[in-house]
Regions:
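Membrane-embedded architecture of ER/inner-membrane glycosylation machinery
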Residues: 180, 184, 294-546, 552
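Membrane-integral, polyisoprenol-dependent glycosyltransferases
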Residues: 2-362, 535-537
Length: 552
C-alpha cells in the first residue's frame, strides 16, 4: 500500500487542478444541472430518499445515485454550486484511481499512472467531472465494475486456451470471491443511470469471451451469484418507487427515458451514425493528438493475428468499443453516453505511452503523435477567438488568450517528441491541459455563466421584486432561472397577445427575456416596459399595463 501512495497522491494533486479548482465558480447551467441540484436538495430537506422530488412532485426520469451522493454535501458546503458538483468530481477522481489500479495490476504502476493521468487531464472527462449530472457517478461505478472483472478474468494466467501467454504465480490465481464486487458496482451503476449498465456489461463480457476464443472458464466469472448481488443492490429501489408511483414510473422511466430515448428521436437528440468519432476526439483532447502511438507498419498483419492478442488488451478494446457501437445505433445521441469508453481508451493510450517511454515501439509513432498533437492544438487555438467573437458578444480576446495557452505548450510537446523525449512530451501535455483548465475557470467562466446560466439576473429580479409581484419569461426558457429564483417563476409566454392579456390581469410584473424579446416588448403600445438589468444576452424588465399607468 505504501508503494502506491505516492502515485495516488500525484493523481489527487492533478485532480485538484483539473477537477476541484474553482468547482463552484460557474453557475449551474443548462437543463440538467439546476434540476438535479434541486432534486438533491429536496431529497435532503424532505428526507424522501426513494422517490426523487422536484418541487414536491415525483421526478421519475433518472435513478437516485447522483441525488444520494450529492444530498449530504449540501450540509457541508455553503456554496450550492460546489455542493451540487462535488460528488461527480469525487467520482471522476475515483474513476481515475480505478484506472491506475487496473493498469498497475495488469501491467505496471507506470502504465496505470500514465493512463489515469491522461484521463484526469482529458477535457471532456474533466468537463463531465465538474458537472452536476448523472453521467460521472454512473461512469465511476461502471468503471469499478469492469476494472474488477478485468483483473479477475483477463489476466494471462487465467487462460487455459492460451499456452503462448506466460502466467506468473500471482496471475495464475483464480479470481475467487473478489470478483463478486464487480457485480455490486454493476448494481450501483444501474442505480446511476438505469438498465443500460446491464446491457453494456453483457455486451463487453460477451465480446471479450468470444474474441478470446472462450479461453475463460465461465465458472470463474461467478455469473449466477454475481447477478444475484446486482439484483440485491438495484432492484429494491425500483420496486419501492414502482410501489409508490405505479405505472407512471414504468411509463416515464423505462418506456420514455430508456426504450423510446434509444429507439426514437423523441427527445430531439438525433445525430448521424458517425457522430461519436469527432466527439471522441473532443472528449479526449489534448490526448487525441497522441493517437498515432497506435500506428503500425503492417496494420493488416496485426489484425490477422488477432487470435494471438493479449487478453488484457482484448478486454480493454471490448470495453472501449461496445458503448461507442451501442450508442451509435441509438436515435438519441449525447456526448455523455460514451463516457464509459474513456477510461479504457485512456489506459490503452497509457500502455502505448509507457512503451514509448521504454523505447519498445518505433520512434516514428512518437514523432507522428507530436505532429498530430500540434495540428489539433493549432486548429483549436486558431478557432477559439473566432468562436468567442461569434458566440459570446465579440469577446474574442478571451478566445485568443485560451488559444495561446493551448498552443504554447503544444510546441514544447512537439519539440520533445521530435527529440524522442517521451516523458517530457507527456508532462508537457499534462501541463497544457492543466494550464488551459486554469485559464478557462479564471477568465472564461464569468462569460460562460452569463450566457448559459441566469444566476445574476435571477438574484437581481428577487432583489427588485415587490411582494407578490409575478416573475415570468417571454420567448425564453431556462431551468436555471427557476432554480435561482427558488422556483418563483410563474409562467412562460411566447407571443405578444399573451403578454398583453397577462398585463391586464397583473398591472405590475417582472419579465426575463432575450435582447430580441426586449425589442418586441419596448415596441408594444399596450404596455410600458422599464429595463432593470441585464446578463449576457438576457434582459430584466418591469412591465406595467399602459392603461393602468394612465389611470394612476
Amino acid at each position: 500500500v505504501r508503494s502506491t501512495l505516492p502515485f495516488i497522491s500525484l493523481l489527487i494533486a492533478i485532480s485538484c487542478g483539473s477537477l476541484f479548482f474553482r468547482l463552484g465558480s460557474l453557475p449551474l447551467s443548462g437543463a440538467d444541472e439546476p434540476r438535479y441540484a434541486r432534486i438533491a436538495q429536496e431529497m435532503r430537506d424532505q428526507g424522501s430518499w426513494a422517490t426523487p422530488l422536484l418541487q414536491g412532485k415525483p421526478w421519475l426520469e433518472k435513478p437516485p445515485l447522483y441525488y444520494w451522493i450529492t444530498a449530504p454535501f449540501y450540509s457541508i458546503f455553503e456554496i450550492k454550486e460546489t455542493a451540487a458538483r462535488f460528488g461527480p468530481a469525487l467520482c471522476a477522481l475515483i474513476t481515475a484511481i480505478s484506472v491506475f489500479w487496473l493498469g498497475s495490476g495488469l501491467w505496471s504502476r507506470q502504465t496505470g499512472l500514465i493512463g489515469a493521468s491522461i484521463l484526469l487531464t482529458s477535457i471532456g472527462f474533466v468537463g463531465f467531472g465538474r458537472g452536476a449530472s448523472t453521467d460521472m457517478p454512473f461512469t465511476c461505478c461502471f468503471t469499478l465494475s469492469m476494472a474488477i472483472l478485468a483483473r479477475g478474468v483477463a489476466l494471462p494466467g487465467q487462460r487455459a486456451a492460451r499456452p503462448h501467454m506466460p502466467a506468473s504465480g500471482r496471475d495464475a490465481r483464480a479470481p475467487g470471491w473478489k470478483i463478486l464486487f464487480a457485480y455490486v458496482f454493476l448494481g450501483l451503476a444501474i442505480l446511476g443511470k438505469g438498465p443500460v449498465a446491464i446491457v453494456l456489461a453483457f455486451g463487453i463480457g460477451l465480446c471479450f469471451w468470444f474474441l478470446d476464443e472462450q479461453g475463460t472458464d465461465l465458472n470463474s466469472w461467478r455469473i449466477v451469484q454475481g447477478l444475484a448481488l446486482t439484483a440485491a443492490v438495484s432492484v429494491p429501489w425500483f420496486w419501492l418507487v414502482f410501489h409508490r408511483n405505479g405505472f407512471a414510473f414504468v411509463s416515464t422511466f423505462f418506456i420514455n427515458h430508456n426504450i423510446a430515448r434509444y429507439a426514437t428521436g423523441i427527445h430531439h437528440h438525433s445525430e448521424p451514425f458517425l457522430y461519436y468519432l469527432p466527439v471522441l476526439l473532443a472528449l479526449l483532447f489534448p490526448w487525441s493528438g497522441w493517437f498515432p502511438l497506435f500506428l503500425s507498419k503492417s496494420p493488416l498483419k496485426e489484425i490477422r493475428r488477432w487470435r494471438q492478442w493479449d487478453p488484457r488488451m482484448i478486454f480493454l478494446i471490448c470495453w472501449f468499443l461496445v458503448p461507442v457501437i451501442f450508442f451509435s445505433f441509438s436515435d438519441s445521441k449525447l456526448a455523455g453516453y460514451i463516457l464509459p469508453s474513456l477510461p479504457p481508451l485512456a489506459l490503452i493510450l497509457g500502455i502505448y505511452a509507457s512503451r514509448a517511454i521504454k523505447g519498445t515501439i518505433e520512434k516514428f509513432r512518437l514523432r507522428a503523435a507530436g505532429v498530430l498533437h500540434l495540428m489539433f492544438s493549432a486548429s483549436v487555438a486558431v478557432a477559439a477567438p473566432f468562436f468567442f467573437q461569434k458566440e459570446y458578444g465579440g469577446n474574442w480576446k478571451i478566445g485568443l488568450l485560451l488559444g495561446i495557452t493551448i498552443l504554447v505548450p503544444a510546441f514544447f510537446t512537439f519539440g520533445f517528441t521530435i527529440k524522442g523525449k517521451c516523458i517530457r512530451a507527456f508532462s508537457a501535455t499534462v501541463l497544457q491541459s492543466l494550464i488551459l483548465i486554469f485559464f478557462v475557470t479564471q477568465f472564461a467562466f464569468p462569460l460562460l455563466g452569463a450566457y448559459y446560466s441566469t444566476r445574476e439576473i435571477a438574484h437581481r429580479a428577487l432583489e427588485l421584486r415587490s411582494p407578490g409581484e409575478p416573475i415570468l419569461t417571454y420567448r425564453f426558457f431556462q431551468h436555471s432561472l427557476y432554480y435561482y429564483t427558488g422556483y418563483q417563476v410563474e409562467t412562460q409566454l411566447d407571443d405578444k397577445e399573451s403578454l398583453v392579456q397577462f398585463a391586464r390581469r397583473h398591472p405590475d410584473f417582472l419579465v426575463v427575456t432575450k435582447a430580441e424579446g426586449m425589442k418586441e416588448i419596448t415596441g408594444m403600445k399596450e404596455i410600458s416596459a422599464s429595463p432593470l438589468g441585464e446578463q449576457g444576452n438576457l434582459r430584466l424588465l418591469k412591465i406595467r399595463d399602459s392603461k393602468f399607468e394612465i389611470r394612476n
